[in-house]
Amino acid sequence: MLFFVGLGLYDERDISVKGLEIVRCADAVYAEFYTSRLMGTSIERLEQLYGREIRMLSRSEIEGEPEWLEHARDRNVALLVGGDPMISTTHLDLRLRAIEMGIDTRVIHGSNIASAVPGITGLQNYRFGRSATVPFPHIVRGKRIVSSTPYNAVKDNLRRDLHTLLYLDIQDERFMCINEAAALLIEVANGSGDEDFASNLAVGIARAGSEDMCVRAGTLLELKTYSFGPPLHVMVIPGRLHFMEAKALRMLAGAPEELLSGYEL
């Protein structure tokens, strides 16, 4: 059987008791951290707490034809991933391939940023629209390309009074920060003639699940220069606010009263 074990948000202690029991009893334990990272720990600390040797898998060993998957035909194999396993389409694809191979699968869910953000900010979870990722700019034929997809997702959600959760890009050991994401969104907006976009309310969250988590609300322009500290970072662009959401942003994220006054439903 193949067990997908979610490790939670930040460090080795975020695993569930059920997940820990499965890891300790499995015949083999693997991990992949290219889809999501636990920034507050290391593979050595995971091995120490869990009492198991853990083999790290590369992207090709997950998305290609993984030889290790064959072991799950007649043994219990645990795959450790950050957050919740099935948030990533990569893991869903792997699970479906395993089922097609006749391998039984089981998912041990973990806390993830999508479910944590409403609790961190006080924004109601049912009022979030489509999420998006803010990617790093890339170069095509010598031209710098900035994706307009996250900006378009935000605008579409705002038209429907919905909040937008923005994931920030990860490339190897390079982590996008809130400041850069805010700057990229403003750049795309200005290029579209939407110069008022920088005045939108935004919420930055750094190191969710850690003891030194940073949560700050302000205009997008203000977040562009605010120091959030080390990664991982995510950002929320809220739509119109229920009065309880507005109160929560004041108390939990330091949102200025004058900024919130135009956002309440």
Swiss-Prot record:
From the UniProt record, which GO molecular function terms apply?
diphthine synthase activity
This protein's assembly is summarised as: Homodimer.
Gene this chain is encoded by: dphB
Output this protein's name: Diphthine synthase
Which pathway does UniProt place it in? Protein modification; peptidyl-diphthamide biosynthesis
EC assignment: the record states 2.1.1.98
Q: Which reaction(s) does its UniProt entry say it catalyses?
A: 2-[(3S)-amino-3-carboxypropyl]-L-histidyl-[translation elongation factor 2] + 3 S-adenosyl-L-methionine = diphthine-[translation elongation factor 2] + 3 S-adenosyl-L-homocysteine + 3 H(+)
One of the GO BP terms on file: methylation
